[in-house]
A protein has these predicted regions:
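Non-catalytic alpha-helical coupling and interface elements of nucleotide-dependent molecular machines
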Residues: 11-12, 111, 115, 165, ...
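A generic structural motif
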Residues: 52, 212, 300-303
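Non-catalytic, well-ordered alpha-helical scaffold segments
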Residues: 1-4, 100-104, 108, 128, ...
């Protein structure tokens, strides 16, 4: 409903003042007519795509409760929502240069109250600062073609478009080409698809090259014809099983890499467990990925990145269609302390040090500065390794006096505990049977 109202507000012939709660032409009908006009003016097609979008907005027209005047409000709930969204949200999207996924934030907030936040489907929306970090890590340029095969509410595509626009400056030809030809996505869930299309259309991406299809069923060779040089993805989490290994996160990763052009860069955010190869199928995916593509590095993220979900994520970066050299040096970074912190009743917020810590990460990633091994380990990698900083890291720092005292204290506490349990043989060289 929110995305539909925002589309209606973007129609030049639509006015909130025309919403009068009329029993003949309801507010919902007026809004849906405006949505239809806005989709046509943006050349959204084919007709099947436009019809699918309109079906997602049907509740605006069909809900009697939304279209009846409320005595307390003195207007229909639809008019109240429309006025609120115009004042608080629409102008921010339309007239400010922002990479913020406002509609995605609405979706996430509503779902958190519904008792069904999409986790049963593995849906975890990507925070805005992660979308922006992807653009930094992949060094997105105005000439790039971006593909997000699990685009959700289009957060990655919005961030990429914002970055490309900024780099393009006032060149309107380049900016128009970015919107028409250089942003592509797939989304399986029809409600998410509608939100994603709305997000792009409101930012003047008229044709919105997002398809409501299952990415895993697409032929990589055909997707490759889009010419994508950048891949960004937050795939569904924890859906893979022994019975259906195609749903593992690494399956999505391999399919994405196969769908990009040679030399393209891709970044994905997945659970840490995906990097360990904990099942035979996942190990097979890791081997196949290295056989055909190159792992550039893995960044361990803040454990609260997806606050309230309980997933410990990592960002993995790859180069497509270049087999991983055995002597390739990868970077494994511990970025858990990213400057973002959880505040009561608010959630994850940017701390005072976040910008500086992000800049340090990028300086290390691009080789502009060195970092101690506790932050970044540079190492070769194999398919049977755990692609995590914690796997490659060896604490080679000289212990401090406080570290030494703590270690001795821990040992003495352990020894005392064992003696009190009549297990002093552990420290005398005797056997457990001697006690008997």
């Amino acid at each position: 409903m929110v995305s539909g109202i925002l589309l209606a507000l973007d129609d030049q012939f639509f006015s909130v003042d025309n919403l009068k709660g009329d029993g003949i032409t309801t507010d919902g009908q007026l809004i849906c007519e405006a949505i239809q006009r806005r989709l046509k003016s943006s050349n959204v097609g084919p007709d099947a795509k436009r019809d699918k979008l309109m079906s997602e907005f049907a509740i605006i027209r069909t809900s009697a409760r939304l279209n009846e005047k409320d005595e307390k409000l003195g207007k229909t709930p639809l008019k109240f929502y429309t006025e609120f969204l115009k004042e608080r949200v629409f102008d921010s999207i339309k007239y400010k240069s922002s990479a913020e996924d406002f509609i995605g934030r609405f979706y996430g907030e509503f779902m958190s109250y519904s008792g069904g936040d999409g986790q049963s489907l593995g849906i975890i929306l990507t925070p805005a600062h992660i979308c922006e970090l992807f653009c930094d890590l992949l060094d997105v340029q105005p000439t790039d073609i971006v593909l997000d095969p699990c685009c959700g509410t289009a957060g990655f595509l919005v961030a990429a478009m914002h970055r490309m626009d900024y780099a393009a400056g006032d060149d309107q030809t380049v900016r128009k080409n970015i919107r028409k030809k250089q942003l592509h996505g797939f989304e399986l869930q029809s409600n998410m698809f509608a939100i994603a299309c709305t997000n792009m259309i409101l930012r003047e991406d008229g044709n919105s090259n997002i398809q409501c299809q299952d990415f895993l069923k697409q032929n990589p060779a055909l997707v490759q014809q889009k010419g994508a040089t950048i891949g960004m993805m937050n795939p569904p989490y924890s859906q893979g099983t022994k019975a259906d290994p195609s749903q593992y996160e690494l399956s999505f990763v391999e399919h994405l890499l196969d769908s990009l052009v040679k030399g393209a860069k891709a970044a994905v955010i997945v659970p840490q467990s995906s990097m360990t190869g904990k099942t035979k199928d996942e190990q097979h995916f890791k081997e196949s990925i290295m056989m055909h593509h190159t792992l550039e590095g893995v960044i361990t993220c803040n454990t609260d990145t997806f606050y309230g979900v309980g997933t410990n994520p990592v960002i993995a970066v790859f180069t497509a269609h270049e087999p991983h050299p055995t002597d390739k040096i990868c970077k494994f970074i511990d970025f858990r302390n990213d400057g973002y912190e959880v505040r009561a009743h608010i959630g994850l917020v940017e701390g005072d040090s976040a910008k500086d810590k992000k800049q340090h990460l990028l300086d290390v990633w691009f080789g502009r500065t060195e970092a101690p091994s506790k932050f970044c380990v540079e190492s070769t990698a194999q398919a049977d390794d755990e692609w995590l900083h914690s796997f490659y890291y060896f604490n080679d720092e000289i212990p401090t006096e406080a570290d030494f005292e703590k270690a001795i204290g821990d040992y003495l506490s352990f020894e005392f505990s064992m003696i009190m349990q009549n297990r002093e043989y552990l420290f005398t060289g005797g056997a457990a049977n001697d006690e008997a």
